[in-house]
A protein has these predicted regions:
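Aromatic (tryptophan-biased) beta-strands that constitute blades/sheets of beta-rich domains
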Residues: 1-72, 77, 86, 96-103, ...
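Repeat-blade elements of multi-bladed beta-propeller folds
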Residues: 33, 64-87, 101-128, 155-188, ...
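Short, ordered coil/turn segments that flank beta-strands lining enzyme active or ligand-binding pockets
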Residues: 52, 83, 93, 114, ...
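Structural recognition of the beta-propeller blade-terminating site
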Residues: 91, 131, 191, 242, ...
Length: 310
């Protein structure tokens, strides 16, 4: 298998209907929650005041049960993904379903909203760009090197699902595909409007080509200081890349042996552009994981040193 295959638009990019550059009006402002944990460094904070007294005004009950992602919200809509492969947009005022879009695999991270568009990574190995107001497909890009399906904890998925979420910054879409380093890890930067490839890194999963060991795509992407950060499994984590070029900037794979004390949690965030906070639940785990309980570790950016865990 050619793990370092180079992606091309002719092979990977599918264009939907209508004009890619023109989308329905959809207002997004700084008070909206347009990305997972509120921003690209995942601070999970907002300047918006929340009332002390609240009351329920509606409740959404799906026709069929599914495990939802967390929500993002903007333009009067609330967006959810789900393990049933669907992306849903609800009216924020009434809870009424506005539109749904079915992908080919489980969606584990919420849509990212940018300039009238909603971006989704799916377990089918594709990155999707939808019109946020209507759910119209603008384009989709196959991040997986080939079309291949396997069973992953009860769901039919690509061997290389896009579970990193989709990060959008300065008009560029970033996402990673893969499960375990042994099968390869694939990180892309795409034009947010057209889906065209700006750069790709197909080698960080095999920093040691003979052992096929390196970075695994084990969590959501974050950005800070001109770098992309990603939980990378039990050999290298967090993984770090140059956001402009895709060059891998972290340590090597060593002898390829798993670090039994490695923090394999799927969450990552940046504090004051100085510290990486990494941890939480494992990417593939039950809510009560007795084998490897979740924890959070802190790393000083630039030093690579652990400054504590909880």
């Amino acid at each position: 298998f050619k793990f370092d295959v180079k992606a091309t638009e002719s092979d990977r990019l599918e264009i939907g209907s209508g004009d890619l550059s023109r989308v329905a009006d959809f207002d997004i402002d700084d008070n909206d929650w347009s990305v997972y944990r509120g921003n690209n460094d995942h601070s999970a904070s907002t300047k918006v005041a929340v009332a002390e007294q609240i009351s329920k005004i509606w409740e959404f009950v799906p026709g069929r049960q599914f495990s939802p992602t967390t929500a993002t919200a903007a333009g009067g809509l609330i967006f959810l993904g789900g393990d049933d492969g669907k992306v849903r947009a609800l009216d924020a005022a009434t809870g009424t379903m506005v539109w749904t879009y079915l992908t080919g695999g489980p969606v584990t991270q919420p849509p990212t909203l940018w300039n009238g568009r909603a971006y989704i990574g799916s377990g089918d190995g594709y990155i999707y760009a939808l019109e946020a107001a209507t759910g119209r497909l603008l384009w989709r890009f196959r991040a997986a090197p080939v079309e291949r399906r396997i069973m992953v904890y009860g769901s039919l998925c690509s061997t290389w699902p896009v579970n990193s979420g989709v990060l959008v910054e300065d008009g560029v879409v970033y996402a990673a595909a893969g499960i375990i380093d042994y099968d390869g890890t694939y990180l892309y930067a795409l034009d947010a409007v057209t889906g065209e490839i700006l750069w790709q890194n197909n080698s960080s999963g095999h920093l040691d080509k003979e052992l096929r060991k390196g970075v695994s795509a084990q969590g959501i992407l974050a950005s800070a200081g001109g770098r992309l950060w990603m939980p990378g499994g039990n050999v290298i984590s967090p993984a770090v890349y140059d956001i402009k070029t895709g060059e891998y900037l972290g340590k090597g794979a060593g002898n390829g042996s798993p670090d039994m004390n490695a923090n394999r949690g799927e969450e990552i965030g940046i504090f004051r552009d100085k510290f990486i906070i990494l941890g939480g639940r494992l990417r593939y785990s039950a809510s009560e994981n007795v084998v490897k309980p979740g924890r959070f570790d802190g790393h000083s950016i630039g030093s690579g040193k652990d400054f504590g865990h909880a």
